[in-house]
Amino acid sequence: MTSTNTRNKGKCIVEGPPPTLSRYESQKSRDWNTFCQYLMTKMPPVHVWECESNHILDFLQSRDQFGKTKVHIQGCVFFGQKEPPGECNCPLKQAWGSLDALIGRLRAAYEENGGLTEKNPFARGGIRIFLREVRGSQAKARGVLYKKKKRLVVVGTGTSTTWT
């Protein structure tokens, strides 16, 4: 493989094949393209710079069809059990961690594609609340307890600390 370097207005440009993307960068690009295509299927089509929280929430819920995590419904005999002893007909959904990672990649891709940080729809409070609710409901359904992290509070001049 040969490549040549040329000068262009003080910037060195390497000609040749594009660099290989990392797994994260490839996934981020795929996620961005999938989201943009999803918006174009809306009636009327929505441009990515016009999308709102409701479009993102609809997209996240549409991802459940590809989920692999069994989430027991309230009336299921296995609801709240970590390791249920049998099978049930409860739905498969996207795991909270997968949705959280997806939002992180889309948040980064939005800004890398020219979106303003302060207008990033993937960083809005409604999206964070949705993810928190999914995390809580999936944890409850699967018998997993998440403990809130305790905050360190510095009292006085910093010589003593207390945990709350």
From Swiss-Prot:
A motif (Nuclear localization signal) lies at residues 148-152. This is Protein LIGHT-DEPENDENT SHORT HYPOCOTYLS 8. The gene is LSH8. Keywords: Developmental protein, DNA-binding, Nucleus, Transcription, Transcription regulation. It comes from the Eukaryota. It comes from Arabidopsis thaliana (Mouse-ear cress). GO terms for molecular function: DNA binding. PROSITE patterns: ALOG (PS51697). Belongs to the plant homeotic and developmental regulators ALOG protein family. Probable transcription regulator that acts as a developmental regulator by promoting cell growth in response to light. It is found in: Nucleus. InterPro entries: ALOG, ALOG_dom. One of its GO terms (cellular component) is nucleus.
